[in-house]
Amino acid sequence: MDDDASMSIRWGGFFESPARNLGLQLMSSVPAERDTKQLLSGSPFLHHQHQQHVPHHHHQPHHPRDCGANGNANGGAMPPPPATEAPPSMPMNFARSDMWMHPQQQQQHHHPREHKALHNLTVGHGSSHIAHHDPVGYGMIPGTHTLQMMQQQTEPQLQPPPPPQQPKEECISSPLIEENVPVIDEPPPPKKRQQGRQPKVPRAKKPKKSAAPREDGAPPNAPAPRRRGPRKNIGMVINGIDLDLSRIPTPICSCTGAPQQCYRWGAGGWQSACCTTTISTYPLPMSTKRRGARIAGRKMSHGAFKKVLEKLAGEGYNLNNPIDLKTFWAKHGTNKFVTIR
């Protein structure tokens, strides 16, 4: 059983060497050290075919690692391979490096999607191709990994393009602000329209004139009392005689047997305080429709009262005496809801 647990079984196919100088020959002269292992050197077929053509044999040093790799199942050490074996004359120009690796080594050193690489190594003046042995796999130089070789070949192709240059405005770095320096908030610049105009100067307010003192002694700032207009002179001409109704005494009503003064109603009209069209009593009862008010008595308008005066003046009645309106109330009824207290 070999170092890579391959059971000395070779499954790879070997073909003739392609054209030389493929750019894969990394080292021109490498001495055959103790780590060098000949590919397919133990094959009985090749040993039988080319044993007679080998003039002399090369001595291969024994190493304890080779004994451990060729040990039997019981743990016993197998003897080293005979020194009489010679490298085959059949050229082996290239070997598969990762094909002979153990699955655990492949997981440690390679990604499962990486492709297999073929390496061609030329050693010596006779251009004989020898596959060097390394714990990584056959056909590789000790200490060299397949991925490193591939990176050396693809370095000029895998260089990333230079990043695009940013515009000058973005490259300008913001000014550094110290921690202890207080930040002063500057007001925003005025608008374009305001830049062309001159700032307005506030006008000076005119001083107020002091109010002159009043004649009645009231303070000057006190509101003036509202004056009432001249009182209208309610007068009428009856039979060529001017009468002032303001000087005529208040009419009365004697429907209850006792004279009761009437109430003013409207502009120059009168209202009874003791009788309605159905009731004649003093005082009138309280209204059931309006709280706090009494039933309104019979009414007489200003025009109707004027006609009464004209009639009495024609008969020679003295208007300086109170007029009894008991017989002059309207018989059809003109009562309205008027508050009488």
UniProtKB/Swiss-Prot annotation:
Ranges of compositional bias, category Pro residues: 78-90
Region (Disordered) location: 48-95, 150-234
Biased composition (Basic residues): 48-62, 190-211
Subcellular location: Nucleus
Example of a GO cellular component annotation carried by this entry: nucleus
Low complexity bias locations: 68-77
InterPro entries xrefs: GAGA-bd_tscrpt_act (IPR010409)
Keyword Transcription regulation: yes
GO biological process: response to ethylene
Keywords for the protein's UniProt record, in alphabetical order: DNA-binding, Nucleus, Transcription, Transcription regulation
GO MF: DNA-binding transcription factor activity; sequence-specific DNA binding
Family: Belongs to the BBR/BPC family.
Function: Transcriptional regulator that specifically binds to GA-rich elements (GAGA-repeats) present in regulatory sequences of genes involved in developmental processes.
Protein name from the UniProt record: Barley B recombinant-like protein A
Organism, as annotated: Oryza sativa subsp. japonica (Rice)
